From Swiss-Prot:
This is Short-chain specific acyl-CoA dehydrogenase, mitochondrial. Its EC number is 1.3.8.1. The gene is ACADS. It comes from Pongo abelii. The modification N6-succinyllysine is found at K51, K129, K262, K306. Substrate binds at S161, D269, M270, G271, R272, G393. Keywords: Acetylation, FAD, Fatty acid metabolism, Flavoprotein, Lipid metabolism, Mitochondrion, Oxidoreductase, Phosphoprotein, Transit peptide.
Length: 412
């Protein structure tokens, strides 16, 4: 898969690299520049987004259209399984590479970005970390090429941020587990071929009684709720998963019984880097839109960019974007180097999501009336940005995570 990405590059960067360089990756960078491998990846993903995603983004949003052909092409490039080892069909890259690719794909189409994020971080991530060899062969390899994608079922109608309060149950019965309950707000639900599902196997133990399961889709006893009509990221389906005596094999449990809450929290820690990167892509394309418009819109005999008030807005937008990008890349590098990254991932997700909302808001202000109509993409960027402050941990949850780690460091 890494070779597929390599083949898309051209010029001196490609000639200077060999496939082996993809496996060397990075340690801690002493330079402000990205390694050549990552620069090449960035350009490859940018070219793909400009050719394949920018032209369809408005249609995807308007028609709630799942971009199946583009997702398939992304699978062929390794973008749906970026840190999955090559022997399992993945690209075998690192999390910094994933963050870079996620930003560029999301810059082209935010809906496609979240489809990519869920498959990489939330579906494949926990199986890679906690799955057995047999589970990886069954539940990872078929989900790397774009033929199949997965989803992650944690939230419920009665709990979102309170992830430990699962009311969905799984009881052991012979050689099976039987699931009952409803999971809510499941991204990719209507297109997914499998789900990582969290259910209580012992309610008396509260969050220590939650377990994780691998569930094929479709399967008897599992039905899908209606597709939610959302404000943004409308090309990615969101729906409930409804379990009614849904029977799955005993070996479908991921990890050990009672490990589900741990698996969920560690998965979300990784996923926040992906969502931060999605937010960066939305913020970048909103800034691009604002600058392009302001350079060409004449007012008082000159382009808008000659006005100090517009320059100040653009400067603030760029500052927020670049600051969030550095936080995101740092979190990814810490993870790649097996250093603690939970606080940094929360900071990245918080900074990037709030930057995306603020930047897309200011982009509309710069465009004025043109920012409020669908003729321009600014209003779509604003709608797409808003969810990044909500899913995979709200901004309030990120602040709790950051404060908790900060205070523990002072008290230790």
């Amino acid at each position: 898969m890494a070779a597929a990405l390599l083949a898309r590059a051209s010029g001196p960067v490609r000639r200077a690299l060999r496939p082996r360089a993809w496996r060397q990756l990075h340690t801690i960078y002493q330079s402000v520049e990205l390694p050549e491998t990552h620069q090449m990846l960035l350009q490859t993903c940018r070219d793909f987004a400009e050719k394949e995603l920018f032209p369809i983004a408005a249609q995807v949003d308007k028609e709630h259209l799942f971009p199946a052909a583009q997702v398939k092409k992304m699978g062929g490039l390794g973008l749906l399984a970026m840190d999955v080892p090559e022997e399992l069909g993945g690209a075998g890259l690192d999390y910094l590479a994933y963050a870079i690719a996620m930003e560029e794909i999301s810059r082209g189409c935010a809906s496609t970005g979240v489809i990519m994020s869920v498959n990489n971080s939330l579906y494949l991530g926990p199986i890679l970390k906690f799955g057995s060899k047999e589970q990886k062969q069954k539940w990872v390899t078929p989900f790397t090429s774009g033929d199949k994608i997965g989803c992650f079922a944690l939230s419920e109608p009665g709990n979102g941020s309170d992830a430990g309060a699962a009311s969905t149950t799984a009881r052991a019965e012979g050689d099976s587990w039987v699931l009952n309950g409803t999971k809510a707000w499941i991204t990719n639900a209507w297109e997914a071929s499998a789900a990582v599902v969290f259910a209580s196997t012992d309610r008396a133990l509260q969050n220590k009684g939650i377990s994780a399961f691998l569930v094929p889709m479709p399967t008897p006893g599992l039905t899908l709720g209606k597709k939610e009509d959302k404000l943004g990221i409308r090309g990615s389906s969101t729906a409930n998963l409804i379990f009614e005596d849904c029977r799955i094999p005993k070996d479908s449990i991921l990890g050990e019984p009672g490990m589900g809450f741990k698996i969920a929290m560690q998965t979300l820690d990784m996923g926040r880097i992906g969502i931060a990167s999605q937010a960066l892509g939305i913020a970048q394309t909103a800034l691009d839109c604002a600058v392009n418009y302001a350079e060409n819109r004449m007012a008082f005999g000159a382009p808008l960019t000659k006005l100090q008030v517009i320059q100040f807005k653009l400067a603030d937008m760029a500052l927020a974007l670049e600051s969030a990008r550095l936080l995101t890349w740092r979190a990814a590098m810490l993870k790649d180097n097996k250093k603690p990254f939970i606080k940094e991932a929360a900071m990245a997700k918080l900074a990037a999501s709030e930057a995306a909302t603020a930047i897309s808001h200011q982009a509309i202000q710069i465009l004025g009336g043109m920012g409020y109509v669908t003729e321009m993409p600014a209003e779509r960027h604003y709608r797409d940005a808003r969810i990044t402050e909500i899913y995979e941990g709200t901004s309030e949850i990120q602040r709790l995570v950051i404060a908790g780690h900060l205070l523990r460091s002072y008290r230790s």
